[in-house]
Amino acid sequence: MIGGLFLNTLSFVIVSNHVIVNNTANVHHTQ
């Protein structure tokens, strides 16, 4: 149960990081 919660949090953090990186990359690319 705790392991599943840890995996969910880890995957959420990874997805959030990818979204942030993609957004900043797009902003730098447009300017």
Curated annotation (Swiss-Prot):
Belongs to the coronaviruses NS3b protein family. This is Putative truncated non-structural protein 3b. It comes from Canine coronavirus (strain Insavc-1). The lineage of its organism: Viruses, Riboviria, Orthornavirae, Pisuviricota, Pisoniviricetes.
